[in-house]
């Protein structure tokens, strides 16, 4: 069997600093995502004083705030948490699409990993399921993805 070098991220958050962007819109969902992300990072060695939660109005504001945080040089990773729930107008498509594209651009342009924890659901029930019930907690998943990516990038 051939031996191939494999680079993997360790799930050790000790010594790392994270910014968590959390929207106020749909905060009854987002607060569960934030709780999951904070708990995950703490369980993996991140000190609570090394986490900063930044509350913003909604998902559309995520990219500009993520950009400012990334440019600050103070954070190893950024976790973007929010919930956009489809309504009767096309507003959902514009907000969800632009927030998603913006966050991806920030990560690529800055080199700072941005965890995508923006729920885009068709109903409140689906959002609740993804905020800690049947479908897990997407805040935890976004935090885990950022932590692993930070540790992988340290090795590249």
Swiss-Prot record:
GO terms for cellular component: cytosol; riboflavin synthase complex. 5-amino-6-(D-ribitylamino)uracil binds at residues 25, 59-61, 83-85, 116. Its EC number is 2.5.1.78. GO terms for molecular function: 6,7-dimethyl-8-ribityllumazine synthase activity. Pathway: Cofactor biosynthesis; riboflavin biosynthesis; riboflavin from 2-hydroxy-3-oxobutyl phosphate and 5-amino-6-(D-ribitylamino)uracil: step 1/2. CDD domains: Lumazine_synthase-I. The keyword Hydrolase does not apply. SUPFAM superfamilies: Lumazine synthase. Keywords: Riboflavin biosynthesis, Transferase. It catalyses: (2S)-2-hydroxy-3-oxobutyl phosphate + 5-amino-6-(D-ribitylamino)uracil = 6,7-dimethyl-8-(1-D-ribityl)lumazine + phosphate + 2 H2O + H(+). (2S)-2-hydroxy-3-oxobutyl phosphate binds at residues 88-89, 130. Gene3D superfamilies: Lumazine/riboflavin synthase. It is an enzyme of class 2 (transferase). GO terms for biological process: riboflavin biosynthetic process. The active site is at residue 91. Belongs to the DMRL synthase family. Catalyzes the formation of 6,7-dimethyl-8-ribityllumazine by condensation of 5-amino-6-(D-ribitylamino)uracil with 3,4-dihydroxy-2-butanone 4-phosphate. This is the penultimate step in the biosynthesis of riboflavin. HAMAP family: Lumazine_synth (MF_00178). This is 6,7-dimethyl-8-ribityllumazine synthase. It comes from Nitratidesulfovibrio vulgaris (strain DSM 19637 / Miyazaki F). The gene is ribH.
């Amino acid at each position: 069997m051939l031996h191939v070098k494999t680079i993997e991220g360790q799930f050790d958050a000790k010594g790392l600093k994270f910014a968590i962007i959390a929207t106020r819109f749909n905060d009854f969902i987002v607060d569960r995502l934030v709780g999951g992300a904070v708990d995950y990072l703490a369980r993996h060695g991140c000190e609570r004083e090394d986490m900063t939660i930044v509350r913003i109005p909604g998902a559309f504001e995520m990219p500009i705030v993520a950009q400012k945080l990334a440019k600050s040089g103070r954070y190893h990773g950024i976790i973007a948490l929010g919930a956009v729930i489809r309504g009767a107008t096309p507003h959902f498509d514009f907000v969800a699409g632009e927030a998603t594209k913006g966050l991806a651009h920030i990560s690529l342009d800055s080199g700072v990993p941005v965890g995508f924890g923006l729920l885009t659901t068709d109903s409140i029930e689906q959002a609740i399921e993804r905020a800690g019930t049947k479908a897990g907690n997407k805040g935890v998943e976004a935090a885990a993805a950022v932590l692993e990516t930070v540790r992988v990038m340290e090795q590249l």
